[in-house]
Regions:
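Anionic-ligand binding patches
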Residues: 1-146
Length: 146
């Protein structure tokens, strides 16, 4: 995109979940989502969300990564097999790392979140993104109105 639009400020982001050193990406299928959620039940999973900002004309390129530690509920506190199935049928988060959307019904599966940039859990670390945009010389609040 940056090659085709050299005047543009290009932002890219992606995420992977890390369960004790094991990467958990996007499940794609229902069966893989069930397996991921069962593995994460009662566990703390670290979600790594990267953001990159590229401004081709100015030569600015930077990347940063935000981590969010997420503790999932266990089977006694809201993450039984029936809870997992009900959640997946309702939301179908098969394109989300870790099989859960914290910005929607997936929050019901979570017991605790910890991060310097909690927006990273939804797929774009906004605090880090703003820092990168400012470093690139983008006037983030220019033209802002109440």
């Amino acid at each position: 995109v940056a090659m085709q639009q050299p005047d543009a400020v290009v932002i890219g982001s992606d995420q992977v979940a890390d369960l004790h050193g094991r990467p958990l990406g996007k499940p794609v299928t229902h069966e893989r989502a069930v397996a991921q959620l069962r593995m994460m039940r009662g566990q703390t999973v670290v979600f790594h969300t990267a953001v990159a900002v590229v401004c081709r004309n100015s030569g600015f390129e930077a990347v940063d990564v935000a981590q969010v530690s997420v503790t999932f509920r266990d089977s006694d506190t809201g993450m039984s097999d029936a809870d997992i199935e009900a959640y997946l049928q309702a939301e179908k988060p098969y394109d989300c790392a870790g099989s859960a959307k914290s910005e929607a019904l997936g929050i019901a599966l979570l017991a605790r979140l910890q991060s310097d940039d909690p927006t990273a859990l939804v797929g774009l670390p906004l605090i880090k993104t703003v820092s990168l945009l400012r470093a690139a010389g983008v006037p983030v609040l220019a033209g802002a109105t109440a």
